[in-house]
């Protein structure tokens, strides 16, 4: 039976788990990307995404609710001033988990967890893909007339012989 399996306990007491998730969420908000295990990243994603959604509405009550979970004034101010402005039009999915392999010491699955809108590499790749698609379409239109010209010249050469 699945009793007491609603979320991953991570081998910790409730107080230790809530303190750890609070500290990890503050680090994620401040640094925009952290390295951790996959299990902790999944637990952190469930913890931090509702807080980011709450930060879209900048009211005294929402600040108090977020502060009760984070317990860090700097993280709360950064969340409400910078991050909430950048993700205002996004309907959810504010974090991304990227697996990086296993840790050498204990073979634990490691990953990055990052805020989606703060990764410059992903934004550059999207622009590059659009540029390559337009080039390909131009090459095919230019290549088609060039292929027709040699085909018409070859029969003329054969008829002359």
Swiss-Prot record:
Family: Belongs to the bacterial ribosomal protein bL17 family.
GO molecular function list: structural constituent of ribosome
GO CC terms of this entry: cytosolic large ribosomal subunit
Gene3D superfamilies from the UniProt entry: Ribosomal protein L17
Source organism (scientific name): Bacteroides fragilis (strain ATCC 25285 / DSM 2151 / CCUG 4856 / JCM 11019 / LMG 10263 / NCTC 9343 / Onslow / VPI 2553 / EN-2)
Subunit-level organization: Part of the 50S ribosomal subunit. Contacts protein L32.
Biological process according to GO: translation
Taxonomy, superkingdom: Bacteria
Feature: compositional bias, Basic residues: 129-138
Matches recorded under InterPro entries: Ribosomal_bL17 (IPR000456), Ribosomal_bL17_CS (IPR047859), Ribosomal_bL17_sf (IPR036373)
Keywords, in A-Z order: Ribonucleoprotein, Ribosomal protein
Pfam families attached to this UniProt entry: Ribosomal_L17 (PF01196)
Name of the protein in its database record: Large ribosomal subunit protein bL17
Region: Disordered, residue numbers: 126-161
Compositionally biased region (Low complexity): 142-152
Signal peptide bounds: none
